[in-house]
């Protein structure tokens, strides 16, 4: 039987913070964690962590283009969230 390695505590906390109460948003945020976060530059990781402190309606507005940001790292995170893995 294969044993799973214990999860990195920081990654576990980030995954937990990706749980928003909207399945679609959960899937997008968790997809970013699984596919992009580890390889992202520190400024992009910081932008993602900041995004997780943003209220859901504002995240949705950013994702749909109804709200724009002039933060280039946050813009890049939004772009990556909308990409298919």
Model regions: which residues?
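Positively charged, polar, low-complexity stretches
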Residues: 2-85
């Amino acid at each position: 039987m294969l044993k799973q390695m214990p999860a990195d505590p920081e990654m576990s906390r980030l995954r937990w913070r990706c749980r928003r109460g909207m399945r679609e948003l959960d899937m997008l945020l968790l997809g970013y964690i699984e596919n992009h976060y580890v390889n992202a530059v520190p400024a992009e990781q910081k932008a993602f962590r900041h995004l997780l402190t943003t209220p859901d309606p504002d995240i949705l507005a950013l994702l749909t283009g109804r709200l724009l940001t002039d933060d280039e790292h946050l813009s890049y995170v939004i772009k990556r969230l909308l990409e298919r893995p």
